[in-house]
Amino acid sequence: MNVEEIAFKYALANAVKYGGKADVKAVMAKLMAEVPELRARAREVKQIVDAVVARVNSMPLEEQRRILRERWPELLEERRAEQRRPGLEGLPELPNVRGGVVVRFAPNPDFVLHLGSARPAILNYAYRIKYGGKFILRFEDTDPRIKSPLVTEEVNAYESIREDLRWLGVRWDEEYIQSQRMEIYYEHAKKLLEMGAAYVDLCKPEEWRRLRNEKKACPHREQPPEVNLELWDKMLEGRFKEGEAVLRIKTDLTHPDPSVRDWVAFRIIDTSKTPHPLTGDKYIVWPTYNFAVSIDDHLMGVTHVLRAQEHSVNTIKQSYVFRHFGWEQPVTIHFGRLRIEGATLSKSKLKAMRIKYDDLTLPTLAGLRNRGIVPEAIWDLILSVGIKPSDSTVALANLFAFNRKHIEPIADRYMYVADPVKLVFEADKELTAHVPFHPSFKERGERTYRLGPGRVEVYIQRRDAVAGKVVRLMELANVEIVRVEGDVAYGRIHSYSLDEAKKIGAPIIQWVWDPVEITVIKPAGVGRKEVEVGLGEGWLERVEVGKYVQFFRYGYLKKRGPREFVFLHD
């Protein structure tokens, strides 16, 4: 692995994108995203990146473009392909756009991403494509007690989120982890205390709630800055226990929403009992969500925040931090909640199920990926809902319809029979069936079956074996079912042409000759699967694992093993 070469690639791409000047932070983020193991050598790697960026920035823009075009043309094509992505033209314009936008996707790594959390990721990135600018990935992990980051032997949520975003085609320009920015938050807390815009509260929780509900100030609110700074130092030194001291932001004690009144910016968490997976017990004073977000949105230059309507109160709370510091608050747009019929999108409920997070019955992105949903289908679904403020409910069938659109052209057709019975009939001549792999792409070829003359045995579905019924064996002949005895149906040739079958209304059915046993896994709700064993063409053994297929009169599937397929949808 040549770190300098990878840095050179991303420095060129970043420079070309921004008029000839690459940004060290952006290049570092790209480098770390591609080679996560370099995080342990961040200081050493940054020295390399600094030198590479300086070299790239000294080149003329045309020289940068020429090298990028010759050596990594896909980086240019990726951006062009993104800009051509269907659905972007339907996005409403954002207010107050000055040049590009700086947006962020800020997941809490207490769980992996699911279909609902894909919405802010895709919408923010879509506007990054539309206007240009930056897309920031920020892990908001400052609650090691209640929402502890998920890092176990089985799953590392930080890395799983990165993997899910890459799969979605969402590429971030910068990455931050809030638990590694604690000193920054402490510095700004100290400034607020010095300004008299915050205070350390030693009230008992029940006493504070009473005063808040009565719209009264707590006795510590008017403490002079020097007293608050001394108490703050004691908090940092560990001289208070959990619940004994908090740092509050001064807001409006008469605000109609009690939760806005002097909200908590820092609290004590005993990390000797609940250590943080990244920082252990190094810190005991932790910023709340609203404080860390306010500081980061400003320092990272975020211009627009797109997030769920449930955060509307948080926007109000954060406004006080921006006002105290005299900062401009980002434009915030709230969209409604997305509900998926037939799918649980609650992180707490999904975690409580104790099912492996990438189980194909789950609506997690890893589960959907394992099932066979393509990322383009998720983009289509999210963009079709858009950023309207009202709640939206869509059926899983909508996602399946988008998925079908994308996999239909690449899914070759095969014959498979569930609940099979043997159909026996006599042929007075050789019967030939030419079955194309895809009716719309003749160039993919066909397979040819020759049966007869004489006794012919094929397998059909039991539901098609009805005495007195004429069926059209696909691409072969029209056969009348004479009688059915257990697992064997007996028939006779009725006619040969497709036109004759259409004339008499005979259904066209799939059939299998010289079959192989096929197992189909069918999701049947969260944590539940049905296993079906049927018979399929021998050609199915030649299909590569991971490929999509369509079984005639059955649906779309993805191959998972030598003779095992996962059912997606019809």
Swiss-Prot record:
<comment type="similarity">
    <text>Belongs to the class-I aminoacyl-tRNA synthetase family. Glutamate--tRNA ligase type 2 subfamily.</text>
</comment>
<protein>
    <recommendedName>
        <fullName>Glutamate--tRNA ligase</fullName>
        <ecNumber>6.1.1.17</ecNumber>
    </recommendedName>
</protein>
<keyword id="KW-0963">Cytoplasm</keyword>
<dbReference type="GO" id="GO:0006424">
    <property type="term" value="P:glutamyl-tRNA aminoacylation"/>
</dbReference>
<keyword id="KW-0067">ATP-binding</keyword>
<dbReference type="GO" id="GO:0005829">
    <property type="term" value="C:cytosol"/>
</dbReference>
<keyword id="KW-0030">Aminoacyl-tRNA synthetase</keyword>
<dbReference type="InterPro" id="IPR011035">
    <property type="entry name" value="Ribosomal_bL25/Gln-tRNA_synth"/>
</dbReference>
<dbReference type="InterPro" id="IPR050132">
    <property type="entry name" value="Gln/Glu-tRNA_Ligase"/>
</dbReference>
<keyword id="KW-0436">Ligase</keyword>
<keyword id="KW-0648">Protein biosynthesis</keyword>
<dbReference type="GO" id="GO:0005524">
    <property type="term" value="F:ATP binding"/>
</dbReference>
<keyword id="KW-0547">Nucleotide-binding</keyword>
<dbReference type="InterPro" id="IPR004526">
    <property type="entry name" value="Glu-tRNA-synth_arc/euk"/>
</dbReference>
<comment type="function">
    <text>Catalyzes the attachment of glutamate to tRNA(Glu) in a two-step reaction: glutamate is first activated by ATP to form Glu-AMP and then transferred to the acceptor end of tRNA(Glu).</text>
</comment>
<dbReference type="InterPro" id="IPR020058">
    <property type="entry name" value="Glu/Gln-tRNA-synth_Ib_cat-dom"/>
</dbReference>
<dbReference type="InterPro" id="IPR020056">
    <property type="entry name" value="Rbsml_bL25/Gln-tRNA_synth_N"/>
</dbReference>
<dbReference type="GO" id="GO:0004818">
    <property type="term" value="F:glutamate-tRNA ligase activity"/>
</dbReference>
<dbReference type="Pfam" id="PF03950">
    <property type="entry name" value="tRNA-synt_1c_C"/>
</dbReference>
<dbReference type="Pfam" id="PF00749">
    <property type="entry name" value="tRNA-synt_1c"/>
</dbReference>
<dbReference type="InterPro" id="IPR000924">
    <property type="entry name" value="Glu/Gln-tRNA-synth"/>
</dbReference>
<dbReference type="InterPro" id="IPR020059">
    <property type="entry name" value="Glu/Gln-tRNA-synth_Ib_codon-bd"/>
</dbReference>
<feature type="short sequence motif" description="'HIGH' region">
    <location>
        <begin position="107"/>
        <end position="117"/>
    </location>
</feature>
<dbReference type="InterPro" id="IPR014729">
    <property type="entry name" value="Rossmann-like_a/b/a_fold"/>
</dbReference>
